[in-house]
Amino acid sequence: MEKIKVANKYQKSIDLLNDALGKEIATSLQYMYFHVHFEDAGYEYLSKKMRMISIAEMRHSEELSDRILFLQGDVNMNPSFTTRQISDPKEMFRFAIQLEHSTIDSYNDAARIAAEADDSVTHKMFQDLAVEEEEHLDYFRNELQNLLDYGDKEYLALQSFARSKAEAEGKVSE
């Protein structure tokens, strides 16, 4: 279907949304990378949580894409960065914290710019996304702090113990 080309008063919002889309796609891929490495190491809870967050980031990508299309923009599905090959859990959490901080800052800026452009829906979308990213940030901070408090061996052993206990009780699920 051919789109009618007109001057789009929402071009600023479309650009912000596409920038966010690239970040969400890249972040989803990064967290999926972490998920498979935690799973391979036998850390079921960490793996499942990372998978859930990766899927949440992909849902964000879909929401952003839907908004771009509604505004009659063109969706750019290119990830904004290449997946980093990180295998150390502390470094995984540190990088995730860095990603979430950066994303929250950019979403707060985008919300402000969208409001200035009189695009209240995109403004609210960025505010809502920032809230979800703050939840991810809180999780990553807590896990990193636990890892630092307990030390690598104890923290990861607790992850394995929790998995074994849950499996024995039939509580491990998606």
Predicted regions and their residues:
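Iron-associated oxidoreductase/ferritin-like identity signal
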Residues: 1-174
